[in-house]
Regions:
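Charged docking surfaces used in two-component/phosphorelay signaling
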Residues: 10, 75, 165-342
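N-terminal Rossmann-like NAD(P) cofactor-binding subdomain of oxidoreductases
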Residues: 2-198, 232-234, 267, 299-300, ...
Length: 342
């Protein structure tokens, strides 16, 4: 899907390389032996000159600027929507294919919103030279639901998320740790990054959207429909942040146009791409957990069961590392599709 240089000669730029997702992007490129002749680490001026480990050596962070993308084939962006809006078109004009992890381009009709396990062919049409990486909570949900949607067509999804603090960045995880220490010692915790105490607490920290929903919840509604190619799918999300460092969890109720049993859902999920299925009778602690998912690639699916109140509907529990499949891994998988190495 890339024109010009062969894949073995691909030059990759990582924008926002010093952030939590940017660092994970570098680790993912290395771990998956992505075929790059050169990797460029880009960030703001205050991060320029930093050294980042890569393939047994170090990359020196360069300051992001208008000329940063000369000779770059693929630019992985994870520096926020403002940076992506400004520099995404610059990178694309310089000849790079942009894979953007921010919310800047996701709902643009000329920008594909891709999850490789769900809609890999969407990236073939990219008139702006930009491909959007979906929101972390959306990615893991659609990976788990796509096999079910193909079999019985989803009518309505009700999802409650339990999202890790790393989704808010390095500073959020640091504040969580300091708050836990303070609370354990009987002191009042410092509250700067979050709008409220996060230690020993659950709450939301996203901006308000429309109709009483947060922006995060609206992302899940709109992105799910776009990725799955079906605007008729109903999505009812409630998103909260929990005092976990890494790993988002989701309780999901799904209704279908054609009734689907839990037994059939398990058959469909076994061996589905990107999924690790946790089966067996319910037992305390036997479900997928963020602590076990952290630092791993799969989307873990468990607690698959028939809904006792709604015949033909099922409930399931979905967990994934939000920095990996929820961000960096998905972006690198898109890059692999571009160079034909997936």
């Amino acid at each position: 899907l890339l024109t010009g240089e062969p894949s073995a000669m691909t030059t990759v730029a990582v924008v926002g390389a010093t952030g939590a997702v940017g660092r994970e992007m570098l680790r993912t490129l290395e771990r998956r032996s992505f075929p790059a002749k050169r990797v460029v680490a880009l960030a703001s001026g205050r991060s320029a000159g930093q050294k980042l480990p890569f393939k047994g050596s170090e990359l020196t962070v360069e300051q992001l600027g208008p000329t940063s993308f000369k000779g770059v084939d693929i630019a992985l962006f994870s520096a926020g929507a403002t940076v992506s809006k400004e520099y995404g078109p610059i990178a694309a004009a310089a000849g790079a294919v942009v894979i953007d992890n921010s919310s800047a381009w996701r709902m643009d009709p000329d920008v594909p919103l891709c999850v490789p396990e769900v809609n890999p062919k969407s990236i073939e049409r990219r008139p702006k030279g930009i491909i959007a990486n979906p929101n972390c909570s959306t990615i893991q949900m659609v990976v788990a639901l796509q096999p079910l949607h193909q079999a019985a067509r989803i009518k309505h999804i009700v999802v409650s998320t339990y999202q890790a603090t790393s989704g808010k960045g390095h500073a959020a995880v640091t504040e969580l740790h300091s708050q836990i220490k303070a609370v354990a010692a009987g002191h009042a915790p410092s509250i700067e990054v979050f709008p409220h105490q996060m230690a020993m607490n659950v709450g939301s920290d996203w901006k308000a959207g429309q109709h009483g929903y947060s922006e995060e919840e609206l992302k899940m509604i709109n992105e799910t429909r776009k990725i799955m190619g079906d605007d008729s799918i109903g999505v009812t999300p409630t998103c909260v942040r929990v005092p976990v460092a890494t790993g988002h969890s989701e309780a999901v109720h799904v209704q279908f146009h054609q009734p689907l049993s839990a037994a059939r859902a398990l058959e469909l999920l076994r061996g589905a791409p990107g999924i690790e299925l946790v089966e067996g009778e319910y037992k305390p602690g036997g479900e997928p957990q963020p602590l076990r998912a952290a630092g791993t690639d799969p989307v873990y699916v468990g607690r698959v069961r028939d809904d006792l109140a709604v015949p033909g509907a099922i409930n399931l529990w979905i967990v994934a590392d939000n920095l990996r499949k929820g961000a960096a891994l998905n972006a690198v998988q898109i890059a692999e599709l571009l160079v034909g190495s997936s």
